[in-house]
Amino acid sequence: ADGIVAVELDTYRGSFXK
């Protein structure tokens, strides 16, 4: 969630997806 779409998605997937 640093502002970059890739990072946002990675953080989101890392929290819920994992």
From Swiss-Prot:
The keyword Zinc does not apply. Transmembrane segments: none annotated. Coiled coil: none annotated. GO terms for biological process: proteolysis. Keywords: Allergen, Glycoprotein, Hydrolase, Protease, Serine protease. One of its GO terms (molecular function) is serine-type peptidase activity. Its EC number is 3.4.21.-. InterPro entries: Lectin_legB_Mn/Ca_BS. It is an enzyme of class 3 (hydrolase). Glycosylated. Has a serine protease activity. This is Major allergen Epi p 1. The lineage of its organism: Eukaryota, Fungi, Dikarya, Ascomycota, Pezizomycotina.
